[in-house]
């Protein structure tokens, strides 16, 4: 059994007292200006194993092809995709951002704690000290009203993650009747 970690939104997070990316045979990181490791779009795959040369050849021939019809924060997954190309410009920015990752994540944790304390909701997702809080997620009953009130207070909101079975690529393959 091979383990591939998805660390796209978890730069700096910890699981079982170890940094994300140190548990499996490979780990995939995804970069974007709005993510914890803020840099131009791209990604990185780190492979821990004997067949690195074989894996490297396969991976080098791939590029990002999965997301289609993106408008703002709305998108659909219509095919399998990759996003792990890297150029020198992005790498230099990433190296500098890596130096700031811990302090930036501490600030995110502070903001998440404040949101958790200040937002009066019946259902809350528990705060975790090992989470890097790429995004602070909540569930509300009246989404439009909530988003309007947040906007009135200059707080940006968005709907970022649709359930996977509602995306084109997966909806014919997976039926999740209780979601």
Describe every region a protein language model picked out:
Residues 21-22, 38, 84, 131:
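Structured loop/turn residues at beta-strand edges in well-structured enzyme cores
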Residues 17, 43, 179:
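Conserved phosphate-binding and hydrolysis motifs of nucleotide-dependent enzymes
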Residues 4-5, 34, 40, 86-87, ...:
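Residue-level micro-sites within transmembrane alpha helices that shape
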Residues 7-9, 33, 43, 65, ...:
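Short, flexible active-site-adjacent loop segments at beta-strand->alpha-helix junctions, enriched
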């Amino acid at each position: 059994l091979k383990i591939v970690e998805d660390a796209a939104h978890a730069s700096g997070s910890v699981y079982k007292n170890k940094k994300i990316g140190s548990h499996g045979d490979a780990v995939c990181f995804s970069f974007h200006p709005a993510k914890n490791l803020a840099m131009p779009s791209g990604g990185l795959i780190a492979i821990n194993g004997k067949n690195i040369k074989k894996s490297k050849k396969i991976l080098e021939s791939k590029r990002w092809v999965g997301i289609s019809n993106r408008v703002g924060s709305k998108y659909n997954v219509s095919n399998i995709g990759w996003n792990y190309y890297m150029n020198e410009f992005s790498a230099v920015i990433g190296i500098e951002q890596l130096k700031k990752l811990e302090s930036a994540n501490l600030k995110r944790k502070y903001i998440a704690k404040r949101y958790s304390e200040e937002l009066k909701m019946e259902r809350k997702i528990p705060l975790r000290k090992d989470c890097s809080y790429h995004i602070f997620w909540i569930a509300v009953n009246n989404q439009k009203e909530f988003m309007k009130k947040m906007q009135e207070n200059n707080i940006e909101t968005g709907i970022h993650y649709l359930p996977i079975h509602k995306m084109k690529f997966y909806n014919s393959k997976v039926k999740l009747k209780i979601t």
